[in-house]
Design a protein with these regions (language model features):
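Short amphipathic alpha-helical segments, especially helix-boundary/capping motifs
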Residues: 2-6, 27-32, 53, 87-94, ...
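Active-site cores that bind ATP or allylic diphosphates and position pyrophosphate for catalysis
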Residues: 8, 55-155
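N-terminal Rossmann-like or analogous alpha/beta NTP/dinucleotide-binding catalytic cores
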Residues: 1-61, 109-121
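Residue-level detector of secondary-structure boundary/capping sites
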Residues: 17, 45-48, 105, 157-161, ...
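Catalytic adenosine-cofactor/nucleotide-binding cores of aminoacyl-tRNA synthetases and other
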Residues: 109, 121-125, 132-249
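A local structural micro-motif
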Residues: 7, 38, 126-127, 178
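Poly-acidic low-complexity segments
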Residues: 14, 18-19, 45, 68, ...
């Protein structure tokens, strides 16, 4: 929608929770869903850059390199040479000229820290505009947040569903079109249509509960469309197979 560059960053600096097969799985899932990135990099490949900037803006201590934040200090580079989350994330954004970021509402507190680090980076590397950050609501199953740490946030749980149906299903969780009748007019969208219509200003920061029954309903109708060789519009308008209001309530 912004005609921008899609950057896939692999956060692999936590060595205890980093396995090659997990990274391969990310690439595979992105490809399966047709989410083609323009640039990809791993944070573990940028350790020299993190150290370079940490030495410029931080102070060497027993804990590594720390940044003076006034009332407290923040470790930005550990003694093992690996950066902390907020430091490497915002330095990546700076180096790659990132303009727009979408994160979960659980990262709101991090934005304050990243602003402070960004200002320090700009002092030694040159001024740049801080990215526009939009916070989206989290996905819950029951009363538990979907989380890879808890093992309930993997796409493997949804492998039998149509990828096209899943993308439409996920889009409806936290994004809405300003036209209140849009969903009934366009209950199914292609990836290209999603990109053209998407506006981060219409993202909701409310948490959403997953209802697999609604996904199953959409998946059934989508597969019926594929068997018939129909377009989404033909299924909705002519066959009346899919009524968005049946699964959007």
């Amino acid at each position: 929608a912004n005609n921008g560059t899609f950057i896939l960053r692999i956060d692999d600096t936590d060595q205890e929770r980093n396995k090659p097969e997990w990274i391969d799985y990310i690439y595979e899932q992105m490809a399966d869903f047709g989410l083609d990135h323009d640039i990809t990099f791993r944070q573990s490949e940028r350790l020299d850059r993190y150290k370079e900037v940490a030495e410029k803006i931080g102070t060497k201590t027993d804990n590594g390199y720390e940044l003076d934040m006034g009332e407290y200090s923040m470790v930005i580079l550990r003694n093992n040479g690996f950066p902390t989350y907020n430091f490497c994330s915002i330095l990546d954004d700076y180096d790659y000229d990132v303009t727009n970021i979408i994160r979960g509402v659980d990262h709101i507190a991090n934005e304050v820290k990243q602003h402070l680090i960004w200002d320090k980076i700009c002092e030694v590397e040159g001024d740049k505009t801080f990215p526009v950050i939009t916070h989206a609501g989290l996905l819950f199953e029951g009363n538990a947040k979907l989380s890879k740490r808890k093992g309930n946030g993997t796409t493997e749980d949804y492998k039998d569903f149509s990828k096209a149906a899943m993308l439409n299903w996920l889009l409806k969780f936290g994004w809405s079109h300003p036209d209140p009748l849009f969903d009934k007019k366009h209950p199914t969208l292609s990836i290209d249509e999603m990109i053209a219509l998407f506006n981060e200003g219409n993202i909701s920061d409310r948490n959403c509960k997953i209802d697999k029954a609604k996904l199953a309903f959409l998946d059934k109708k989508w597969k019926a469309m594929e068997r018939r060789g129909n377009t989404a519009k033909e299924v909705v308008v002519e066959s009346k197979l899919l009524k968005f209001d049946e699964f959007s309530k």
